[in-house]
Swiss-Prot record:
It is found in: Cytoplasm. It catalyses: guanosine(2251) in 23S rRNA + S-adenosyl-L-methionine = 2'-O-methylguanosine(2251) in 23S rRNA + S-adenosyl-L-homocysteine + H(+). CDD domains: SpoU-like_RlmB. This is 23S rRNA (guanosine-2'-O-)-methyltransferase RlmB.
Amino acid sequence: MSEQIYGIHAVNSILTHSPERLIEVFVLKGREDKRLQPLLNELYSLGIGVQFVNRQTLDKKADGEVHQGVIARVQAAKELNENDLDEILANKQNPLLLVLDGVTDPHNLGACLRTADAAGAVAVIVPKDKSAQLTSIARKVACGAAETVPLIRVTNLSRTLRDLQQNHNIWVVGTAGEATETIYQSKLTGPLALVMGAEGEGMRRLTREHCDQLISIPMAGSVSSLNVSVATGVCLFEIVRQRLGS
């Protein structure tokens, strides 16, 4: 089974981290971009087929999404699950995890993956139900982070959170607008799982009940909430700030 990846950063990331998955690459004919030539040189050296096509063909393949003149057809990645998460955590001393509960927009998933990578998160955990798929759009928005940050799909999110607490000694912190303690009042330097809920609805009840602590982002203006990917960035980089200072 194959899937498409588009955008220079996303294709570069697959080339760097999983070149064996590349099947063929489509490039816009006449495209002049200094970032493209090193990519083409690497593809040629690996013997990966490159086809130069017109814009109409690329636009059709990308379903109208921005593709930056390059699309790769790749073998579908293996879906990671709870067992893979245990292996990842076995080698980490002070892990930071991002948990997304009910985030169904692929743009938001991609943005959260990109931020998770920048913040040093070892994995992003999502439930199998009511969660965005790692589509071409999500990979494009992730800007290569979809190949570097493991995306773990779990059958039962509440059970996974309990396992993190009991078997990996990870503190589970959930975000909730009504929480009286803000992220800036919380100590977030140890092994941690940050749980972000869907926009509007927030975390599901069982997810909330399995959090060790609830925190909020203080809002100084008239809006009552932030986009989930923006809120994720605020929270993750407050955690990064605290860790750097500890």
